[in-house]
Amino acid sequence: MKPKTSVNNQSTATVREPYTTGSVTSQDGTTIGYRQYGHGPGIVLVQGAMGSAQNFMQLAGRLSDTFTVYVPDRRGRGLSDLPYSKDYSIQKDVEDLDALLAKTGARSVFGLSSGALISLQAALTLPAIHKVAIFEPPLFINGVPTAVLPRLEKEIAQGKVAAALITGMKAAQMGPPIFNVIPGFLLELLTKMVMAQEDKKGSGEYLPMRALAPTLQYDFQMVVEMSGALESFRAINAEVLLLGGSKSPAFLKVDLDALEKVLPHVKRIEFPGLNHAASWNTDRGGRPQPVAQALRRFFAEL
C-alpha cells in the first residue's frame, strides 16, 4: 500500500484526507482498487453512478476516527479501470465486494444509489455482512424506465457522451427542475461546454464526466435487472439502516417506504433539507457530516 494525501485542485473546494491504496482480485480476475482511511472496525463504502472513491473523501474522513474505512472504485472507473464486460450482471459487483470483505474482514457496508442496490443484494447473499446502511436505492417500485437502456447504449456507442449524460440524468430524475423545460439540444450544448472546460482545466482527483459516462449503461442495466427483487429482501438477516433526503426525488421515497415494509431488521432516517447527493463531498453538492453521524451511531451499536 502507498500512503497518500489527496488534494483536489479545483477552485470550488479543497478536500484533503490521508489514505493508503490497495487492491483485491475478484472472482473473475478483475482487479478492484480501493482507498483505506483510519483505524478501527471495518466499513466499506460502495459508490453509485457517476461517482468514484474521490466522491466519498469527506465521508470517509469523518468516519476514520472510529473505523477503518475502505472505499473501492467500482468496475470501469479509477483504480478499477478494467471496463465492464458484455456479460455484466449485479453479481459481478457483489463478487467484487465479497473479495474486499474477505481481504479486510469488514462486516459493515454503506451503499449509495446503485451502490445501495449492490449492498442490498450482497446482504442477501453474503453472510459476512452483519450491518448495511443504504442511501436511496433506485428500485423504481412504480415502474422501471427500461426504454432508457437501449438509448444509452446507442448514444455511448456513437460517442454522444453529452447526450448519454442527459439521458441518464433525466431517467434517474436527478437533474434540476429546469431540465424539464430546457430543449434537449440546448441541454446537450451546455453539457458539452461543461465537459470542454473539464477537458481543458482537468478535474482534480475526480474522474471526468467523459470517463464515467460509459459506466452509466451498466448502472441502468443493474436497475432493470433488480426490478421485481423487492420481496427477496425479506430474507436479509443483516441489520439495515435506510437513509434518504427530504429533497430527493419522490420515487426514491416510495422505494424506501416499500423496503421498510419488507426488511425484517430495519431502521430509517430521513435527513431534512438533504438530497440524493448528501453523502458526497461538499464541492459535489453533498453534506456528509450528518450522514457520517448517522452511520457512526448505527455501525457502533452492538
Where would I find each of the regions flagged by the language model?
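Hydrophobic, aromatic-rich cap/lid helix
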Residues: T191-G228
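Active-site loop/oxyanion-hole signature of alpha/beta-hydrolase fold enzymes
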Residues: Y70, R74-F110, G285-Q293
